[in-house]
Curated annotation (Swiss-Prot):
InterPro entries: Capsid_hemagglutn, Hemagglutn_HA1_a/b_dom_sf, Hemagglutn_influenz_A/B. This is Hemagglutinin. It is a single-pass type I membrane protein. The lineage of its organism: Viruses, Riboviria, Orthornavirae, Negarnaviricota, Polyploviricotina. Binds to sialic acid-containing receptors on the cell surface, bringing about the attachment of the virus particle to the cell. Plays a major role in the determination of host range restriction and virulence. Class I viral fusion protein. Responsible for penetration of the virus into the cell cytoplasm by mediating the fusion of the membrane of the endocytosed virus particle with the endosomal membrane. Low pH in endosomes induce an irreversible conformational change in HA2, releasing the fusion hydrophobic peptide. Several trimers are required to form a competent fusion pore. Belongs to the influenza viruses hemagglutinin family. In natural infection, inactive HA is matured into HA1 and HA2 outside the cell by one or more trypsin-like, arginine-specific endoprotease secreted by the bronchial epithelial cells. One identified protease that may be involved in this process is secreted in lungs by club cells. Palmitoylated. Major glycoprotein, comprises over 80% of the envelope proteins present in virus particle. The extent of infection into host organism is determined by HA. Influenza viruses bud from the apical surface of polarized epithelial cells (e.g. bronchial epithelial cells) into lumen of lungs and are therefore usually pneumotropic. The reason is that HA is cleaved by tryptase clara which is restricted to lungs. However, HAs of H5 and H7 pantropic avian viruses subtypes can be cleaved by furin and subtilisin-type enzymes, allowing the virus to grow in other organs than lungs. It comes from Influenza B virus (strain B/Finland/145/1990). It is found in: Virion membrane; Host apical cell membrane.
Amino acid sequence: DRICTGITSSNSPHVVKTATQGEVNVTGVIPLTTTPTKSHFANLKGTKTRGKLCPKCLNCTDLDVALGRPKCMGTIPSAKASILHEVKPVTSGCFPIMHDRTKXRQLPNLLRGYENIRLSTHNVINAETAPGGPYKIGTSGSCPNITNGNGFFATMAWAVPKNDNNKTATNPLTVEVPYICTEGEDQITVWGFHSDNETQMVKLYGDSKPQKFTSSANGVTAHYVSQIGGFPNQAEDGGLPQSGRIVVDYMVQKSGKTGTITYQRGILLPQKVWCASGRSKVIKGSLPLIGEADCLHEKYGGLNKSKPYYTGEHAKAIGNCPIWVKTPLKLANGTKYRPPAKLLKER
């Protein structure tokens, strides 16, 4: 008679690494990893996802929306996840801005980090009667409103001395900026200042010297001195050429907290403010958002989770995402492989 062992006689192609025995051949494995391929970014399943700050504001950058450019006013939808699609936001199309002097480029990114964002229905201060006034509110043909008349950003008032009596140099003046949001939100208050060449500075403000500006809120203070002249004429988005520039900044005021702005001539006083609450997870990506996905990954776009782990490029991801591992993982679902037993000799 011949006696045979009851195991498979085929070779095992499966090798797993174990903690105690190193590489081991097994009779079966379940792959636990996948290597994604790049895809479009998508809406995160089960979550409101925000692409542009204002989806219905056509031909507007997120910076336009954040500053309140006249033709870029609209509702910002609530969202638990937001796509940072403008890595370096382009300049606003309303008036030449000196971006490199402040954190103005960060304003859209700041807003994206909130779940709920709304613009106040009324102004935070009366700019016409602010210290150093009376003022007339300046507008620009480069910043047309919805009726194509001259306009300016909704978040700021360009305070130009109203008559020759107060069109003079001034010592630093201070205005308090109250908290006006009504639901305990963070108040994001936008402000800035305008400067031009000496001739225009005298014409507008009665003073051609550099002007000083300071803002303070929530323990954060910023100081600026305006630059006079040296600007080439610049037109934004088909507007009129401008010899002047504006510097834009913002301050975050917590519930009930008052901020202050100290200024001289050329101030852009805060007007409508952003009231923002909740948190929205932000990830770098691209638009448009197509379909839905379990996970949004900076390198791969929208991913649907088919395995618990993934290999490939490691980057920030949000949602129901697989976990990055350096090498593929396998789960053994069979037994340790043993080579076929040799037949016993006949007795």
